[in-house]
């Protein structure tokens, strides 16, 4: 326990909270351009080919973002909207691409959980 004199001399340091998505710079989403679209394999015990894109954001950061849903139309130079949110079995992937906005079209034939994949209500 510090004495009163020690506390006067130098005050207690505030605990700084570290953001989990620094490339967004405090914004809920950021626009970016795809520089590379490719697949990577998840860590053990999972096995798949997960679709990801390397995105250059308007904030100047170059990040790796996950492309959710089945099938996509993204390629190099596609303009996408990126939100925070990591993918647990892909190390280094801390962002998601928002489907149904800008160049990323919604998932085809999606019936449930449509709002997360940018799909309009079927007629």
UniProtKB/Swiss-Prot annotation:
A Pfam family per the record: Ribosom_S12_S23
Family: Belongs to the universal ribosomal protein uS12 family.
Protein name per Swiss-Prot or TrEMBL: Small ribosomal subunit protein uS12cz/uS12cy
GO BP annotations listed: translation
Keyword Ribosomal protein attributed: yes
Function summary: With S4 and S5 plays an important role in translational accuracy. Located at the interface of the 30S and 50S subunits.
Organism: Arabis hirsuta
Entry GO terms, CC: chloroplast; small ribosomal subunit
């Amino acid at each position: 326990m510090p004495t009163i004199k020690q506390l006067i001399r130098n005050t207690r340091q505030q605990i700084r909270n570290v953001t989990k998505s620094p490339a967004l710079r405090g914004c809920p989403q950021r626009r970016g351009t795809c520089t590379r679209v490719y697949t990577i394999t998840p860590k053990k015990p999972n096995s798949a080919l997960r679709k990801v894109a390397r995105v250059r954001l308007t904030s100047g950061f170059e990040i790796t973002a996950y492309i959710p849903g089945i099938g996509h139309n993204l390629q190099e130079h596609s303009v996408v909207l990126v939100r925070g949110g990591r993918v647990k079995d892909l190390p280094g992937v801390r962002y998601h691409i928002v489907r149904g906005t800008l160049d990323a079209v919604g998932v085809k034939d999606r019936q449930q959980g449509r709002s997360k994949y940018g799909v309009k209500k079927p007629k």
